[in-house]
């Protein structure tokens, strides 16, 4: 989850990532799809600048805008992801690409969106939908490019959704996590609350590919989807880095033992960031990480994820609540999963919305969540290129292997643990770290209802 810019980051200046925000109003973290006002749209880029971005995004050979090169698609490995017309209706969306960009980096678009478009072309545009939310950050012309991209996407035969909401996560006095959750839910709204013309086009078999503002290659996207499918995972996550190799999403991600991916002492220092997965309880995860094998976690996001839509389609047993409802209560297992903030009045730990999303998945029995170390991402074009040199591209890790899982020397197949850890580390701030029951507030409240 990208919460800042490179210039504002230093290894000892990360307390802001876990700082408390304004107290939540009320106790309804699940009413988050309410009507959203669109932000004013003032063009920031010239027509020629927009044209150069579009040219670079849709034309793989274009050099109109700078970007690093990515490997060609390993067709043999990923061909099984292409829906076969004999078995899949063309009226159904098999893939939904969900991007929450928030105007944080127009310079990323020639790499990010070019990779998304190449993935859609490979998977079959008619089976794909692209939903974007642009706006809410420092304006630099992202929305100008996204608007101009519409005819290109629709011309491919894919569905295109674009919103520019007046939701600003950094607004003083507002709950940051609540606003981030609202943005993520807005990206998913075409699926969770479809228009009449799209009703029935999304199914429990739809795979959602949710990408933050990262420098990503097409093979990164396809590998996440591939691992989700071959591992029978509920969700797969990338690994994101800064400083040419420091793991980034420390506040959000939790290991299968419920701990952070590296130790952050109470003073907030990142002095132990070089010691990833250090605990004996995470020894298997560390072994698999070192071997660049996917490993199971309690929670992750790390810049990009792939998850199946089934948890979003849960059919509620309570009157008036359906899978497409704007109201989803995390305490009711029959309700669909949505991004949310913590239930403050019930004493639930203040966590990032992706952590709570994973927690709610576990609560509903969707705990097969894995991080995929072969997919290494970063948040600027230059850092993205650097991290590929340090960690390698996906193809550097998997070679020319096909879709079959490699069983030597360490099995690629995950042996899934179906029970969550008893406790998870809560870090509202690094100074106030404590261990809490993994289902805190959910379990207690569910007994009362």
Task: List each language-model region with its residue ranges.
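A Trp-anchored, charged/polar loop motif used as the substrate-binding/catalytic surface
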Residues: 72-82, 184-193, 278-293
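Phosphate/oxyanion-binding active-site loops and adjacent basic polyanion-contact surfaces
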Residues: 102-112, 138-142, 175-184, 349-353
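Active-site donor/metal-binding and catalytic loop motifs
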Residues: 9-12, 364-388, 400-401
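N-proximal low-complexity "stem/linker" segments adjacent to membrane-targeting elements
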Residues: 1-118
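Short, acidic, metal-binding catalytic loop of nucleotide-sugar glycosyltransferases
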Residues: 114-127, 152
């Amino acid at each position: 989850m990208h919460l800042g810019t490179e210039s504002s980051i230093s290894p000892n200046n990360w307390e802001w990532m876990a700082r408390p925000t304004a107290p939540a109003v009320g106790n309804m973290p699940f009413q988050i799809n309410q009507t959203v006002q669109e932000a004013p749209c003032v063009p920031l880029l010239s027509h020629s600048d927009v044209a150069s971005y579009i040219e670079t995004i849709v034309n793989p050979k274009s050099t109109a805008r700078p970007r690093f090169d990515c490997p060609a698609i390993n067709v043999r490995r990923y061909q099984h992801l292409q829906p076969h017309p004999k078995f899949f209706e063309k009226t159904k969306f098999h893939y939904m690409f969900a991007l929450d960009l928030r105007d944080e980096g127009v310079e990323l678009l020639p790499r990010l969106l070019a990779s998304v478009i190449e993935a859609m072309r490979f998977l079959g545009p008619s089976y794909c939908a692209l939903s974007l939310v642009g706006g809410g950050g420092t304006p630099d012309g992202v929305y100008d490019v996204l608007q101009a991209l519409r005819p290109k996407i629709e011309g491919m035969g894919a569905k295109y959704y674009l919103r520019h909401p007046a939701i600003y996560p950094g607004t003083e006095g507002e709950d940051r996590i609540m606003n981030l959750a609202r943005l993520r839910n807005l990206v998913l709204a075409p699926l969770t609350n479809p228009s009449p013309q799209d009703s029935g086009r999304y199914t429990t078999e739809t795979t959602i590919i949710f990408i933050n503002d990262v420098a990503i290659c097409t093979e990164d996207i396809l590998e996440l989807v591939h691992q989700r499918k071959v591992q029978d995972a509920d969700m797969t996550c990338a690994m994101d880095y800064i400083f040419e190799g420091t793991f980034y999403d420390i506040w959000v991600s939790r290991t299968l033992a419920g701990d952070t991916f590296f130790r952050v002492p109470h003073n907030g220092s990142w002095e132990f960031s070089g010691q990833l997965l250090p605990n004996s309880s995470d020894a298997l995860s560390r072994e698999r990480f070192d071997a660049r094998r996917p490993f199971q976690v309690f929670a992750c996001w790390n810049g990009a994820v792939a998850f199946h839509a089934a948890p979003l389609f849960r059919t509620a047993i309570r009157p008036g609540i359906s899978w497409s409802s704007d109201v989803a209560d995390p305490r009711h297992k029959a309700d669909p999963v949505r991004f949310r903030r913590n239930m403050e009045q019930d004493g639930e730990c203040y966590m990032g919305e992706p952590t709570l999303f994973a927690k709610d998945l576990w609560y509903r029995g969707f705990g097969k969540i894995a991080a995929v170390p072969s997919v290494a991402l970063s948040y600027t074009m230059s850092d993205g290129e650097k991290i590929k040199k340090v960690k390698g591209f996906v193809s550097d890790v998997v070679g020319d292997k096909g879709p079959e899982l490699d069983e030597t020397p360490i099995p690629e197949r995950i042996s899934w643990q179906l029970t969550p850890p008893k406790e998870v580390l809560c870090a509202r701030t690094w100074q106030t770290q404590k261990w809490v029951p993994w289902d805190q507030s959910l379990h207690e409240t569910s007994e009362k209802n």
